[in-house]
Amino acid sequence: MRAALSTFAIAFVVVACGPLPGGGNAVTAASVAVQSSDLPSGMQKCDVSGDIDAYLAKVKAKDPTHYTTIKQEWDDAKSHGATAGQVAVYADTADHCAAFQSNSSDITTATFKLVVNFVIEFKDEAAAAKGYTSESILGFSPSTIKSSGSVPVTEGTKTGLSANSIVLTLELGGQSFYVAVWQNKKFMSILAVLNFDQATSTKIATAVNGRIK
């Protein structure tokens, strides 16, 4: 279970899309990713947040193993049609932001409130759908989420996100995990919410999904 979540945590990326119908504002990686307004008060945006290249530069020195893994997986994702990525990380204190940056490879060890969101933009919706259904994007595939066997998952429209979606929820050793991965239009979003109640976690995912136009 922890191995599956660790693999999943390696993989979060946000997107930039085309112009909204009837308006001049573009949907961007920054506008889709988790925002402070999506979260309960007190959560801090970690300095490691940013586009995927900036994220990699920031984690390289403190977690070289994570850097190498994500760099290889991001290069692979681009070969399958990914064109842009953004990472949003929030924690309940500045010290916990630093703890994440030093151990990004395994967020399952976090006993504090943590939100990590990667969203990927693909060249088109078909590439995004294939990324979700057929590829391992940034180390993720639906089978990875389901590999723990006994852990309950919800898939498809029942998640409230999209037809291509999967949500895992788990309480383990005093920790709570909410992991949602979904494809909507040109975007694939990977979201991990740790140590929040399920209603709050679902609200965060819904807010992110609602900004994909």
What are these regions (language model features)?
Residues 42-46, 52, 126-178, 207:
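Short Gly/Thr-rich strand-loop-strand
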Residues 102-105, 170-172, 182-185:
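Active-site beta-strand termini and strand-to-loop segments that position acidic
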Residues 18-103, 151, 203-211:
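N-terminal "mature-domain start" segment
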Residues 116, 178-195:
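Short, well-ordered beta-strand elements
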Residues 13-16:
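C-terminal motif of bacterial Sec signal peptides marking the signal peptidase cleavage site
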Residues 36, 45-47, 52, 107-121, ...:
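Long, low-complexity, Ser/Thr/Gly/Pro-rich intrinsically disordered segments that act as flexible linkers
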Residues 2-10:
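Sec-dependent signal peptide recognition
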Residues 85-132:
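A short acidic-to-branched-hydrophobic micro-motif
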